[in-house]
Structure formats: C-alpha cells, structure tokens
A protein has these predicted regions:
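Bacterial N-terminal signal peptides
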Residues: 14-22
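Zinc-dependent metalloendopeptidases
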Residues: 27-350
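Glycine-centered loop-to-beta-strand initiation motif
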Residues: 229, 258-270, 274, 278, ...
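Hydrophobic beta-strand segments
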Residues: 242-247, 276, 407, 496-497, ...
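Surface-exposed, short loops/turns at beta-strand junctions within beta-sandwich domains
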Residues: 270, 439-443, 523-530, 625-629, ...
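A short tyrosine-centered beta-strand micro-motif
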Residues: 272-278, 446, 632, 728, ...
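A sequence-level detector for low-complexity, Ser/Thr- and acidic-rich stretches
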Residues: 362-383, 388-395, 401-405, 466-469, ...
Length: 850
C-alpha cells in the first residue's frame, strides 16, 4: 500500500542530521504556510503566505547531496535518481514560470555556503510508510531555503527511482519546499494514498492554482474564476480549517481551507461548471508529530486549530450530489456568498480510501468480471470508455473499507444493491462497485461520492477514464546508428520512452497503429554495461508496466571505459563576474539537452551549456555579487553518468574595476534570439572606459560597433550576414582591460507561426480553446528545409514545456505543417506556443488551453 507523510521547515544544508532536526512544524488544500499578520484571534484577517522573495523571473535552484542514498534497489543508480529529481524540478518550472524558475543545480558537498535562496535534496533513513519529507525554512514569511528529504534506501518506500511513484513523490516534496501544503483533491500535493498523478499529468488544477497564488504574474487570476463564502455550524459558530472544494463533475477539482472566522476563497478555478462541497479534515491530517498539515498562526505565533468534525455537504447543504447546485465559473469573475451550514459529527464516515482496477493481461483493458480471467491489479483505477460496464474496487489504505449505502459517479450513475458488493481478503474488506456508462463518454479523471446513513465521503479523481488499452512493449532492438527501436502495442504520438526513469529523445515519428507500432529513440547517455529498464508512458497516464507479469524489458549499454573529467578551463571567478568554462572528459556520451553542469552553490549560476562533442562541453557561468568567497564542488551529469570534483571551483573577492559581460541580446527587443545580419547588444559594467578604443571580437573576427552604441553599460555591434550559426567566443576589451570571454549562441533566423488549428482544421482562438490530448497543427513559414530530414532539431513548446511532435509535412504556399500532441491541461490559461529550431524560437503564439 502507498502512504506518504511529510514535514516541513528544514534549515540550510548541514546535511542530513541537521535538516532532520530543523524539520519542525509543517500547512493550506491548495494551502500554503499561512500567517495571519492582523486580526488577532477573531478577524477580519490579513493573510500572508511563506514564499521565496525573488525578483520576477528569478530562479530557485535545488542541489542534491553528493552522498546519495546508502542502499540502491537492484538495477537502480544515482544517475537514475538524479534524473527523477531533475524531471520533478522541470515539472514545477513548467507551471511556475515565468515569474519563478525552478532548476536543478547539480551536486553539493556538506556544509556548502550560499547567500542565494534555493533548495537541498538529501537522503535519510525514513520510518516505514514514509516516502519523503519536504518543506521550507523561513525567516518570518520569507522562505530562505527549501529542503527535500528522500529515502536513503531506494529498495524501500517509493521504490526504485526509475518507477513512476518515485517521480510523483519527488514532485510532491519539491512542492512543499516551494511553499505548498497538502490538499485532498487527488492532485500532486495530495498525500500519496490520495494522489492520482503520473508522468504524463504531474499536476492538476489545484496545484497550478496553489503555485500561482504564491508566484503567479500580475493579473494571472484574470484567466481563472473564484468562489468565496463562509462555513458555519448550525449555532452560527465559525468552522476553521474546513476544506471547500470546487469540483467539475468530469473535470478539475480546486480547493482551499477556511480561515479561523469560517470564511474562504478559492482562486485559480478554470472556467466551467462546478459543484461545491465542504468536508472536514481527515483524522490523520494534523498528527501530533507534525508530519502533516502545519497549522496557521496569528501575529503572536499562536496556532489556530481545526474546529472539529462535521458532516460533508454539497452546496446548498445537501448530501445528495444530484441536488447540488451547479455553478458557472467564468474567467475574471468571483462568485460570492456561497455559504454552508454544517452539522457536528463524532467522526468521519471514511478517509484514506484508494481505488483499483483489474486489467486483462491479454487485452490490457479493465475487466468487468474476474471469473476465470488472468488479471493485473492497478492503483489507482482505470476504466476504458469503449466499454459499457465499469468495475472499480474501493478499499481502505489500512483495514476495512466502511460500507456505504450507494456510490455515485459525478456526471454518471449510482451503484447500489447488487452493483455494490463486499469483497473480503487478507488485506481487509473492500467494495466492488459496478457502473454502466455510455461508450465514448469522454476521458480524464472521474470522481466518486460514497453515501452513508447521515454523511457522505467524496473521492476526487477516484479513477481515470481512457480511450485505449495500456501500452505493452514486445521488443527493444538496437540499431546500427546507436538508436533503439521499441516495438509494441497501443503506442501513439503521445507515447514517451524512458530508460531507467530518464526520457529518451525521439529520433523519428511514431510508426504503426494501435495493434503494432514502433518508436525509435536515442537512449540517454549511460555507463558501459548498464542494464536499463525500458518503459513506455502514454499521455493518458497509462504505462507499459500496467499489465506486465514480468519485469520491464531491458537495454544493455555497450561496454566502455570509466568516465572522468579531464580538464576545466576556468576554476575561479570573482564575485559579480561572468565567464566561460570549457570542459573535456573521457568515456562520456553527451547529448544536447540532457547535460547538467553544477558548481555546488546557488551563488554560481550556469547560464547555458553547449554540447560540442561526446566529451566536450562549454558553458557560461556567473557569480552573484554578494557570493561567499570559498570553494565548491563541480559536477557534470549526463544521462546516468555522474562526474564530480569537490573543492574545485573558487569564488574570489569582488574586483570592482573588472569589465563584466552580464548579458547579450538582440538589439531589437522584439526578437528573442541573435542571428546573422542583426545588431547585438552587450550589457554589463565597465564595458567602455575608453569608448574609442573598445574592441569586440566574435569567433576571433573583429566586429563593427554601432555608431553611438558604445557606452559604459552597453556596447552594440553588428553580426555579419554570413556569420556561421552555432556558439562563438565573444571577447570585449574596454580600452584598458579585457573582460572574461563568454560563449554566444548565433542562431538561424527563427520560423514564423502563421496559424494554429485542431485536427479538423478549425483555428484556435478564445472561443475555440485547445484541450489536453488534442492533436494540434501549427503552420509555419521560413523553416529551414533540412529540418524535415532531421525532425529532432525541432521542438514545440507550450508555456515552455516541450510537447511530443508527431510529424513535419510540407504544406501549401511554402508553409510547413508541424503536428504535435497536447499532453497536459493548463486550466484555461492563455499560454505561449512556440516552434523552436536549433534553439531559435519563433515569436510566441497565444493559445488558450483548457
């Protein structure tokens, strides 16, 4: 059984024991670490949440302890684990940007000093049933450090790091470190026993609302709606810390907890129809050991306690979901005065319930009747919308499941009598629930309501409705060029291939159909002789381990020598300076986009990495002006290969007379990249002590400064039209002394997006939004024709998150049709869609994604 608890408030790295000691009190459904800075004990209150205090667009980097776990599960590795942490951070970055960037900073040593806010990932022995810990260390309401503690034994807890549960656990704990607390909606911030997320869908609308409440850009709420009101007992007393949930019958669930005066407000609700219900916190929400919700505090630091147990009701005060009022939530609107009156109860009827389905091992579809069938049990449950009957098992995470009188599927039917059966096994009493449903009744999470004598229990995201069977891998075959072809059934354009938990790069489009298809990928860089498990994940949340009675198929990496670092061209910089470091190694296999270079401290930022060869990297780095002088660890991580050297890089005292290149951009601020035939602008300090003698070279070619464009803080220069694309070394001499050189990426001119349509050819606009799992066509002009022969050079991003590209096809009028699969819902937000070629991005195209 899966169960997770967590705590919060870790201090800065000292490393394991000190963080465990510092983990003190943990708090809000999308809920935060809440302080009421005015209002005393009765209100009205002024609310302030703990969060990182960084500039808009600033970065919080997380560093992983170089000690790693003490024990690894068979086949597991530090490289695989780091891959999961990196992906978890990238997932948060995809929903927290543009105001907050969340990055993986590499490895760090014990006791590393840093003035920059950030986070640490460390490993400790955890009690049974505890998968991880996470939370912030704060100065008042400002988070100064976040910590994530994972098990030092990957054979226990969340299991081997290459499995999906380790990834979703990492996402959950990073959320705590960023300032989010538990929720009860099945989202990423729900405890593991309730959580219904996956690699394909790491978040739900509740998580998006929560992170935007802390770090969203100005006006973010204009793309969402809100609901507000109060919860009171029958005697008029306020109900504190009640969870109020806006739930779409076949869609998202977004929640909040009530204030001590009973008031609540749920922000970040995607536009649509919702039911509203309120429920008490479960008995394990606020345990005595503070491994759950951290209670809010008043201005004197005193806690506010939950008001106690009451009966769950839908608005307006009914236990029958069929009598609940439907609320139409619109963008930018607030629905007010949605008030509840609740009745006290001695206990809740149920909590911590989980669901399961039984997949046929041959068809990989959920079974309705288990008689004489071979099956594989999957948590949480899945149902297939091509089947008229749905069978779901509901059981308690521990012990017997309380037996309700009926079970209702929101937006569907009700099971009772012969369609609600009791099943007993050694693990305890379970419920077998049977529903009828029209075929092709949509896809996505579905919610259940269990009705008891005088109370109800709501299970948001109780099971997932999908349209095809789970994928299955039948063969893994190496090809002559180093790529790997994975063959199987129920693959598609949304299918992603993972080697020991790290995503492989697609080298060709999906080929085949549901019965038999293949995906050709470039495996992540590995070490010689490594045996990697190969798992295929589909966009609907299913993966190829679902109906497998055996371990996943494997891929063995070719034998090779021991990887090592040969040379670092730069081993020190003054505080406030920038520079370029050139790194050469042995026996590595660097792949662009899969390499992390770290300098062990949040004071040192890696701005960009270029892969120049399988054993050759170049990177630009910068040191914070207030950086602590001293040494730090250099790490190079590529796929599963992890290289590090402790105490290798030195931060020196600041040199105030040194010219520093802080940034380089296209002088035309409407363009996002630098390419031949344009003016580029160098920004920094001390750039032109003697403007008439300033020299700029690019790739050892002398550049022509722009007339009147040479200033102490900015130097503009022209890039010749025939200058080659790729990284080039930029040097500047201010007339007295040279700045540290940096690398500058010269891109090809970007493509231009002309139109974006759905699979039926209907153009997307505000009235025609995109939805998760849409097949989207983007028509672009000015695309380099050689990209058609090498589609891996092209990416499509939505809100900065890469989407699976299905095909590139020549279209009419010299355009190119780029087709991609939209893997994730973004809750009705207007997001930037971009087509990126060799790192050169088109201008953003606004796309509304439900």
């Amino acid at each position: 059984m899966r169960q997770i608890r967590r705590t919060a408030r870790p201090a800065r790295l000292c490393i394991c024991a000190a963080i465990a000691f510092a983990l003190g009190s943990p708090a809000q459904a999308y809920y935060h670490y809440v302080h009421y800075i005015t209002g005393g004990r009765t209100g009205p209150f002024t609310i302030q949440q703990e969060k990182f205090n960084i500039r808009a667009g600033g970065t919080v980097s997380f560093f992983v302890s170089d000690r790693g776990p003490a024990v690894y599960a068979p086949g597991d590795s530090f490289g695989s684990l780091l891959g999961q942490v990196k992906q978890a951070l990238a997932a948060w970055d995809s929903v927290s940007s543009p105001n907050l960037r969340v990055k993986f900073g590499g490895l760090e040593s014990d006791g590393q000093s840093s003035t920059a806010p950030g986070g640490d990932v460390v490993f400790q022995e955890l009690p049974p049933g505890l998968y991880g810990l996470g939370g912030p260390s704060s100065n008042g309401t400002t988070i100064v450090r976040g910590a994530v503690i994972l098990s030092n034994n990957t054979a226990a807890g969340a299991g081997p790091s290459y499995l999906e549960n380790f990834f979703t656990t990492a996402v959950h704990e990073v959320g705590h470190a960023l300032g989010l607390q538990h929720t009860w909606t099945g989202s990423a911030m729900s405890q593991d026993v309730l959580r219904n997320t996956s690699r394909a869908r790491p978040f739900d609308a509740d998580d998006v609302a929560a992170i935007n409440m802390l770090y969203g850009p100005a006006g973010w709420q204009n793309s969402f709606g809100s609901i507000a009101g109060a919860v009171r007992f029958a005697n008029g007393g306020a109900v504190s810390l009640a969870s109020v949930v806006a739930i779409g019958p076949t869609g998202a669930a977004v929640s909040s907890l009530t204030n001590p005066d009973g008031t609540y407000r749920i922000d970040g609700i995607p536009a649509g129809n919702y039911l509203l219900y309120v429920h008490p916190l479960p008995p394990d929400a606020v345990p005595a050991d503070e491994t759950g919700l951290r209670l809010p505090r008043d201005q004197n630091g005193e806690q506010f306690l939950p008001s106690g147990v009451f009966g769950t009701v839908f608005y307006p005060n009914t236990t029958d979901p069929r009598q609940a009022k439907s609320l139409q939530v619109s963008q930018g609107d607030v629905i007010r005065e949605q008030n509840f009156t609740v009745q006290s109860r001695g206990s809740v009827p149920a909590y911590d319930l989980i669901t399961a389905s039984y997949l046929d091992t041959n068809t990989r579809t959920p079974l309705y009747d288990l008689t004489n069938r071979q099956w594989w049990k999957v948590y949480p449950a899945y149902a297939n919308n091509t089947q008229a009957g749905i069978f779901i098992e509901v059981r308690a995470n521990s012990g017997d499941a309380p037996v309700p009188q009926s079970v209702t599927m929101l937006g569907g039917g009700t099971a009772s009598g012969d369609y609600l059966q009791i099943y007993n096994d050694p693990a305890g009493r379970a419920l077998w629930v049977y529903f009828g449903m029209p075929i092709f009744a949509g896809v996505g999470p579905r919610h259940l309501v269990l009705s008891y004598a005088n109370d109800i229990f709501v299970m948001p995201q109780a099971f997932n409705l999908v349209r095809r069977p789970a994928p299955a891998v039948t063969s893994v075959r190496s090809t002559f060029d180093g790529s790997v072809t994975v063959t199987g059934g129920n693959f598609g354009g949304d299918s992603l291939v993972y080697f020991d938990g790290i995503q492989a790069v697609r080298s060709t489009a999906f080929s085949g159909n549901d019965l038999q298809g293949s995906l050709t990928v470039l495996p992540p860089a590995g070490t010689g002789g490594q045996v990697a498990r190969v798992i295929v994940y589909n966009g609907d949340g299913q993966n190829s381990t679902f109906a497998s009675l055996n371990t996943p198929p494997t891929y063995t990496y070719p034998n090779g020598g021991t990887p090592q670092i040969d040379r670092l061209s730069l081993t020190s910089l003054p505080a406030g300076a920038t520079g370029m470091v050139d790194i050469t190694t042995q026996n590595m296999a660097f792949v662009d986009g899969q390499v992390t270079i770290g300098f062990g401290s949040g004071d040192i930022t890696v701005q960009r990495v270029w892969v120049l060869g399988p054993n050759h990297l170049t990177a630009n780095i910068s040191v914070a002006a207030d950086a602590v002088a001293g040494s730090s660890e250099v790490s190079v991580i590529s796929g599963f290969a992890v290289l590090s050297q402790t105490n290798t890089f030195q931060v020196l005292p600041r040199n105030f007379s040194l010219p520093v290149i802080s940034a380089v951009a296209n002088a035309n601020t409407a363009q996002q990249t630098i390419y031949p035939g344009v003016f580029a602008a160098i920004y920094g300090v001390n750039l032109a002590n003697s403007p008439s003698t300033v020299q700029v070279t690019l790739g050892d070619q002398l550049m022509t400064p722009q007339p009147n464009g040479v200033l102490p803080g900015q130097v503009n220069f022209f890039i010749p039209a025939n200058f080659p694309a790729g990284p080039a070394i930029l040097r500047l001499h201010n007339g007295n002394v040279a700045a540290n050189p940096i690398a500058l990426q010269i891109d090809v001119p970007p493509p231009t997006i002309q139109s974006v349509t759905n699979a039926s050819g209907v153009a997307y606009d505000a009235a025609h939004p995109a939805f998760a799992q849409d097949v989207v066509s983007v028509y672009v002009s000015n695309l380099d024709p050689t990209v058609l022969g090498n589609p891996g050079r092209l990416q499509v991003t939505v809100n900065g998150q890469s989407m699976p590209v299905q095909s590139l096809t020549p279209a009419a009028n010299g355009l190119t049709q780029v087709t991609f699969f939209l893997t994730q819902s973004f809750g009705g937000a207007v997001l930037n869609l971009a087509v990126v070629v060799d790192g050169s991005s088109s201008a953003p195209f606004p796309l509304t994604v439900r």
